[in-house]
C-alpha cells in the first residue's frame, strides 16, 4: 500500500464505512496489532459511522470499532478502528508525535478543509518524513479537486463510481433570503418551501439550514403538521439519542421532515430521503475582531456543497432538490470551500505546532501555507500570554494551554484561576466570550461591564441563549476540574453565584486579552450627529490602539480596564464588554523597559525607565547614567528621521559648502569626493555623530553644532586641501575686500557679486580651478542693482563700460565714475 493515497467516490459509495473495515482486514495480515485512526470532521458523523461499522462487524460500539470526541468517548483496549474529531487528532499527534501503534490515518470528508484538518495532515506528513515512513495516510472525499491534490502530495488517486440516482433540480423562492437575512426570515422562507415540496412529491424531506436557531424557528412554524408528520431537528449540540432518531431508517408509514445543519451533507445516509431543500446558506468559521476569537457567521455555500446537498436526495433512488437561490446566484458561488487556514485566527494552530515541536511552522509540508502576517499576529499574542518564548518555542505554561481543548485565549484565562471560586467565574466568562454578547451592546440600557452579563446568566431562566450559556459554562467547569488542581466539588445541578470580587473578572480577562489592557487618558471625544452628541472617554490599550467608552458608563470611573470585546473603526475602537482592573494587578503585570528616544515635538532626548504592559506605559521615572555611546546612537537614529529640524542644515553657509563640493565633484571626479548633500549627511550621522554630539541632548544644543565642519569631516585632509585650492571660498578685490564665490551645481560658472566701483583696477576676470575657469562677475550699481554679467572684464572695460558709465553717472551723480577704471 502506498504511503499516501487519495480515494474519491460519490456520496453513499461506502467510503466512510467499508474502506476502514477493508483496511483492517489488510492490517490483520500486515500488522496484526496496528490501529487505524479515522478523522471525521463532525461529531454526529463520527458517532454514527463508528456505530455503523461496529454493527457491520457484529459488535458493540467501543470494542474493535470506537470513537472519541470532546467530552465523549467509547473505546477500549481492543479498539482497532477509532473514529475521532479534528481537535482530538491534533491532540493525539502533539502528545505522541510518532503515533505509536497506529498503522494508518484516514482523513474523511477532506474537502471541508478545516484548519485542524490541514494542521493534522501537515504534522503527519512531517512525521512520515522524519520518523514514520511506514505510516499510511488515506485522504477521502467525494468532491475534492483530485488532480490538484494528487500533484500537491505526489500520490495516486483511487476512484470508484459508486451507485447514485438522478436528482431533479427545482428553484423555489429564489434569492428571497441571503447571508444577511435574520434567522426568523430564513426559517419562514424555508417553511414555505417545505409545504410546497410536501404537496408536490412523496418521500421524506431533508432540509438544510445554516444553524440551530433557524432549525428551531422552522420547527415552530411547521408545528401544525406535527400530528401527521415527524419533524426532526438535527444539529451538533442535540443529545445523541435525538440525533440517532433523526438519522434512523424510516418506518415506512410516517413521512419525516429532517431539519438539519450542514452536518448531514456528507458521510450520513438517511434512508427514505428523496427530497432535499437547500437554503444555500451555512455557518462558516471566521475571525471575529471584536472578541479576538474565531466565530461562526452565516455565508453562502460553495458549488461543491450544493452538489453534496443535492446528492442526498439520490442516495437510494431518484429524487428532487429545491434550491432556494437563482441560477444567477449559483453562477457567482465559489467552486469549492476556501481553506479555513487562509482566513481563520491562527493562534490555536501556532500554539499546537510549537507544542508539537517537530518542525518550524514555515518549513512544514502545508497544502496551503498559512499567511505569514496571520502567523506573526498569532505569535505576538502567544508571546504576550507567555505561551511561547521569543524564539517561538513553547513554554511550560504554553504546554498547559495547549492541553486544553479550547482557544488559547480561553485556556490562558482558565489557567489564571487560582481558586475554585475563580475557576467558576472563569468558566462563566469563557461561555460568554465564545458566544455572542447576551445583551445588546449598543443599547443605552446596558453598560459595558462584564458583571452585568454574569448576573444575567445566573438570573435569566428563560430563553435558549441563557440555557446555552449555562450549559457551556458547566462544560468548562468540568474541563477545568479534570486538568486543574482546584478542588471543585459541588453538586452537578448547583449553579455557582456571580463573583463578589469586583477585580477578579478583570484579572481573568486580562489573562485572555493581554493586548487589551486599557488605561484611561485625559482625552474625551464626541460621537454622533448634531442632534445627539455622546461624550466618550478615551482609553489607550496595550496594543497601542485607542478605544472609546461612553462617558456615562459606570466603568469610566475606573482608570484601568480589561477589554473583552471591541470594534475598530479606522484607528480607534469602541469598547463593548470590559471589566475593571485593580491598580495592583496592573502593576504586577508590568515589565520594566529602559526607553531612550528622541521626542521631536518637544525637541529633547527622553531617557526614562518605563513600567509597561505591551505598548502601554503605566508609569515612568527619569533614567540617569546612560553611556555616551548609547546616547549618540539614539541621536544618530533620530537624525536620520528628523535631522533637518534638529540641526542647522539650512544655513546659507552649509548650503553653499554643499554646492561647492558638488561642483568640484563634477569638475574632478577623480578626487572621489564623498556625497555631501543633506540626505548623505543625515544618513551618515552614525559616523560623524560621536565627534560632534558631545553631551548635547536638546534641539537647541544640537543646532549649535557647526554643520560646515560636519560636512568637511566627510573629506580626507588631502581632499579638503584640493577643494580649497581648486574652488576657493572667496576672492580678493582691488578695494581690499573679499567677496564670496557662489557655487551652483549645474551652473555654467561660479558667481561673484560685487559693486562695480570695488572692481576698479581689476583688469582680468579672476580664475579658479587652477586657472582653468573664469568666474562669472555680477557687477552691481551703488544701490546693489545688477548692471552687467561678464566673464571677460578686460573686454568689458574697453567696450561696454562706456555705455554703462553714462547711465551710472546720470543715476548716481555724486559717485566718481572714471573714464579708465
Feature locations, PLM:
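Extended active-site and interfacial segments that coordinate phosphate-rich ligands
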Residues: 96-111, 121, 279-283, 292, ...
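P-loop NTPase motor module signature
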Residues: 1-413, 488-492, 566-567, 725, ...
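Charge-dense polyanion-binding interfaces
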Residues: 106-107, 230, 237-239, 243, ...
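A short, compositionally biased
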Residues: 61, 531-536, 723-727
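Charged, non-catalytic accessory extensions
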Residues: 542, 606-821
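Short, isolated positions in well-ordered beta-strands
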Residues: 165, 547, 738-740
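Second RecA-like catalytic domain
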Residues: 17, 228, 233, 277, ...
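Short acidic-hydrophobic surface loop/beta-edge motif
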Residues: 71, 157-160, 534-542, 729-734
